[in-house]
A protein has these predicted regions:
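Conserved phosphoryl-transfer catalytic core
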Residues: 15
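Short, flexible active-site recognition loops that position polar ligands and cofactors
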Residues: 144-154
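Conserved AdoMet/S-adenosylmethionine-binding subsite of the radical SAM
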Residues: 1-9, 18-145
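A C-terminal junction/extension of Radical SAM enzymes
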Residues: 155-177
Length: 177
């Protein structure tokens, strides 16, 4: 409780925080201390999310690709059934009324512009009002990265204009601007 008054809340992030079976107890303890609780998740374990959602104040939900394209989604995540797990988690969050943002870390080799726009249209159709586009960047200090650097031309100015028009709250996070 030494931090009370210094902190407004605690955000559970990771990796993927929902893989930790201790997460529900940790969230309850933080909530019992009077802090707001945020969660960063890709939604890969809907059952654990469902258990803690009543205690969560805000969710940053990572969406990797259009969830309607399960093959692409699974390829981007490297895990089978990840699109269906994401969709289940997305529906749980929507139904809960908890504030959330959807965000995508994008690289043109995995999410070409046409797929990025397909994803954005899906989010729009689902009523998402806050979308953050995070352009992939190499990890700081990394000597090797599995992906080449992303140029400032991704996404195009036209695509950027569409994205800004789709969402009341559109955020672009990148290092080259």
């Amino acid at each position: 409780m030494r931090r009370k008054g210094l902190l407004d809340g605690v955000v559970f992030s990771g990796g993927e925080p929902t893989v930790d079976p201790a997460l529900p107890d940790a969230v309850r303890r933080v909530k019992d201390m009077g802090f707001a609780v945020g969660l960063h998740t890709g939604g890969i374990i809907p059952k654990r999310l469902e258990e803690i959602l009543p205690l969560i104040d805000w969710v940053g939900l990572d969406v990797k690709a259009p969830p309607t394209d399960a093959e692409l989604y699974d390829r981007v995540t490297g895990r089978p059934h990840s699109a269906s797990h994401f969709l289940e988690s997305f529906r749980l969050i929507q139904a809960s009324g908890v504030k959330f943002e959807c965000r995508t870390t994008a690289h043109p080799d995995y999410l070409p512009e046409e797929k990025l726009l397909e994803l954005a249209r899906w989010l729009l159709q689902e009523g998402v009002d806050t979308f953050a586009l995070q352009i992939y960047r190499r990890p700081m200090g990394a000597l090797f990265s599995p992906f080449p650097a992303v140029g400032s031309d991704y996404p195009s100015e036209e695509a950027r204009a569409l994205l800004k028009g789709y969402f009341p709250h559109f955020i672009e996070r990148r290092n080259d601007r």
